[in-house]
Swiss-Prot record:
PROSITE patterns linked to this entry: DNAJ_1, DNAJ_2, ZF_CR
SMART domains xref list: DnaJ
Stored InterPro entries: DnaJ (IPR012724), DnaJ_C (IPR002939), DnaJ_domain (IPR001623), DnaJ_domain_CS (IPR018253), HSP40/DnaJ_pept-bd (IPR008971), HSP_DnaJ_Cys-rich_dom (IPR001305), HSP_DnaJ_Cys-rich_dom_sf (IPR036410), J_dom_sf (IPR036869)
Alphabetically ordered keywords of this record: Chaperone, Cytoplasm, DNA replication, Metal-binding, Repeat, Stress response, Zinc, Zinc-finger
One MF term in the entry's GO annotations: unfolded protein binding
Organism: Chlorobaculum parvum (strain DSM 263 / NCIMB 8327) (Chlorobium vibrioforme subsp. thiosulfatophilum)
Domain notes from UniProt: The J domain is necessary and sufficient to stimulate DnaK ATPase activity. Zinc center 1 plays an important role in the autonomous, DnaK-independent chaperone activity of DnaJ. Zinc center 2 is essential for interaction with DnaK and for DnaJ activity.
GO cellular component: cytoplasm
Gene name of the record: dnaJ
Family: Belongs to the DnaJ family.
Name of the protein this chain belongs to: Chaperone protein DnaJ
Needed co-factor(s): Zn(2+)
Classification via SUPFAM superfamilies: Chaperone J-domain, DnaJ/Hsp40 cysteine-rich domain, HSP40/DnaJ peptide-binding domain
Binding locations of Zn(2+) 2: C186, C189, C212, C215
Length: 401
């Protein structure tokens, strides 16, 4: 996910142009490739600063970015075209940058902090000559949402219907950004969305291919902007989506719904909707892969003599037989009562962990019975040396009848 442009430059959202320019100059000098040879991290930071400044130094792009985020400037920003011709893979010599910072260069090209290079085309930019066709509009951004599910829903799979807020196509202009619904071919780049910019440095001349500054890299311009969407072709709206979640998903898994993300400005293709799964904690069961675990407390007499109990599952109750002589922490398995496998082909199991129930308060009669039971030499763990004829469970059966 792209970082916030204000965060990249280290300025507030209310920063004026001078503050933005100063912040950019500082970063450009610090991370310039000439100063950091073979340093990929510095190169990426330099590109980030270029991209951020290209947007925030332009009033129209900054307004669109403040309103729509990266989606509003996606095409021009993503092109890598830096201010004053420093994007697109070419970098000015750092000595020239320093000279311009200290006032040694001639200011031209709309106030770029790196302006001052002599452009061989005379006007700063020339048309791309229609080298290639441009796709319509800017691609919409992906939208991420979180979906909380119960263990019961995860076990069987579920269909969810949700209302989500996202950028939708403007109904007033049908997404064109134009009142009349029409756009015109950009006269600067002749529809290619790109221009060539040539500059001279102390090491010679270099040429960059950058996004057209007139159309933002789209190849089309809007003359009569729609007043409802300010010429963007998209607005904030609310839509209803259906999400089919298969059985067996886990916390952190995600589903991608192609084309259901934010609409693209001015007819651009929509982004994707990314649904991140969050599993709600369950008050009875613990999950272990596709198996689930349930803790069952059973009284001591039932552990000794055996019993049948009702056990909850994810889809109702079942009868479980606790065999006589079951030891604490024994796991009893109920097959197929776990969570459906994500790839199909059955379900996990339910494991019942049996523990002994110890009451905090007992009646006088119960105390007398326990005292009588305690007298038995076979009720304590070291009874084996005293009597080998009957086991502890056989003795307990005799006492409890």
């Amino acid at each position: 996910m792209k970082r916030d442009y204000y965060e990249i430059l280290g300025v507030s959202r209310s920063a004026d142009k001078d503050e933005i320019k100063k912040a950019y100059r500082k970063l450009a000098l610090k991370y310039h490739p000439d100063k950091n040879p073979d340093n990929k991290e510095a190169e990426e930071k330099f590109k980030e600063a270029n991209e951020a400044y290209e947007v925030l130094s332009n009033d129209d792009k900054r307004r669109r970015y403040d309103q729509f985020g990266h989606a509003g400037v996606g095409s021009s920003a993503a092109s890598g075209g830096g201010p004053g011709g420093f994007g697109g893979g070419g970098y000015a010599d750092i000595n020239d940058i320093f000279e311009m910072f200290t006032g040694g260069g001639r200011a031209r090209g709309g106030g770029s902090p790196f302006s001052g290079f002599e452009d061989i085309f005379g006007g700063g930019f020339s048309g791309g000559g229609g080298r290639r066709a441009r796709s319509t509009g800017i691609h919409g951004t992906d939208l991420k949402i979180r979906l909380k599910l119960t263990l019961e829903e995860i076990a069987k799979g579920v269909e969810k219907t949700l209302k989500i807020k996202k950028q939708v196509v403007c109904s007033e202009c049908n997404g064109t950004g134009s009142k009349s619904g029409k756009t015109e071919t950009c006269q600067t780049c002749h529809g290619s969305g790109e221009v060539r910019q040539a500059s001279k440095t102390m090491f010679g001349q270099f040429v960059n291919i950058v996004a057209c500054p007139t159309c933002g890299g789209e190849g089309q311009v809007v003359k009569d902007r729609c007043t409802s969407c300010y010429g963007e072709g998209i607005k904030q709206g609310e839509v209803t989506v259906k999400i089919n979640v298969p059985a067996g998903v886990q916390d952190g898994n995600y589903l991608t719904l192609q084309g259901q993300g934010n609409a693209g400005p001015r007819g651009g293709a929509p982004g994707d909707l990314i649904v991140i799964i969050e599993e709600k904690p369950h008050d009875q069961f613990k999950r272990n892969g596709d198996d689930i675990i349930y803790d069952l407390a059973v009284g001591f007499p039932d552990l000794v003599l055996g019993t049948k109990v009702d056990v909850p599952t994810l889809d109702g109750h079942v009868k479980l037989t606790v065999p006589a002589g079951t030891q604490p922490n024994t796991m009893l398995r109920i097959g197929g009562k776990g969570i459906g496998h994500l790839k199909g082909g059955g379900s996990g199991d339910l494991y019942v962990r049996v523990n002994v129930f110890v009451p905090k308060d007992v009646s006088g009669k119960d105390k007398e019975m326990l005292k009588e039971l305690k007298k038995s030499s076979h009720i304590s763990p070291n009874h084996g040396e005293q009597d080998h004829e009957k086991s502890i469970f056989e003795k307990a059966k005799d006492i409890f009848g």
